């Protein structure tokens, strides 16, 4: 369960971060972030970095959609603007296979919030409010580590590049991310993965 720390920066204007298309973290940066992030958020960011889940998907994730037996995360609902919404397209409604690091993170998280409805939640059991998490946890951590300030959505782009770099099948990666084809993978991420070649014959 997430425990909020006192915000010593109350009254300070939030950091302005320009919107960028794709600016993934390196594996070394991911490891640094996970090493130094607040312990109560380590599982949260581990899942983000190694599944590519969208913010609305991970914030709306309920335990009933975590299948430990099959090692899958079922994307069926999202949390958007304080409301639960069902996934509307075949691409967004999907099953994500858990890598071992994700499986272990969710096992650890279950010990903390397993009696709650939501996987990652406040003390009251309500879904995380992503703006609060970003301002209180994400941006301060990046500043502390001296890393380039990037929006949390870059964790999704990072997951894509890490999976491609590790040699995973592009069609499998596309399904994990909710893409209908592999075209976007190569068009968007190829410049971040040295020696990447297409394996789907296209």
Per-segment meaning from a language model:
Residues 65-72, 149, 168-188:
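Short, polar N-cap/turn motifs at the start of nucleic acid-interacting alpha helices
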Residues 10-23, 27-32, 51, 60-111:
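Conserved tyrosine-mediated DNA breakage-rejoining catalytic core shared by Y-recombinases
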Residues 16, 24, 79, 177-201:
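Catalytic-site neighborhood detector that most strongly recognizes the C-terminal catalytic loop/helix
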Residues 2-6, 52-54:
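Extended, charge-enriched helical/coil interaction regions that scaffold DNA-processing
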Residues 39-42, 46, 50-57, 132, ...:
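C-terminal catalytic core of tyrosine-transesterase DNA break-rejoin enzymes
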Residues 28, 70, 77-78, 99-148:
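Active-site/catalytic core of tyrosine-dependent DNA strand-transfer enzymes
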Residues 19, 41, 69, 92, ...:
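Exposed loop/turn and edge beta-strand positions of beta-sandwich/beta-sheet ligand-binding modules
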């Amino acid at each position: 369960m997430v425990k909020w720390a006192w915000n010593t920066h109350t009254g300070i204007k939030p950091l302005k971060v320009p919107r960028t298309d794709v600016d993934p973290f390196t594996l070394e940066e991911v490891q640094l972030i996970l090493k130094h992030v607040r312990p109560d958020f380590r599982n949260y960011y581990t899942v983000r970095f190694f599944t590519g889940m969208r913010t609305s998907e991970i914030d709306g994730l309920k335990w009933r959609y975590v299948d430990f037996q099959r090692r899958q995360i079922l994307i069926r609902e999202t949390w958007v603007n304080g409301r639960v919404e069902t996934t509307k397209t075949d691409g967004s409604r999907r099953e994500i296979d858990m890598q071992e690091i994700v499986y272990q993170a969710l096992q650890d998280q279950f010990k903390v919030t397993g009696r709650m409805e939501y996987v990652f939640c406040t003390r009251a059991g309500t879904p995380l409010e992503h703006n609060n998490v970003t301002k209180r946890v994400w941006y301060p951590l990046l500043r502390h580590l001296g890393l380039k300030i990037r929006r949390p959505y870059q964790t999704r782009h990072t997951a894509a590049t890490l999976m491609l770099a590790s040699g995973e099948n592009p069609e499998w990666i596309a399904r994990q991310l909710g893409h209908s084809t592999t075209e976007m993978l190569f068009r968007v991420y190829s410049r971040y993965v040295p020696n990447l070649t297409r394996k789907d014959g296209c």
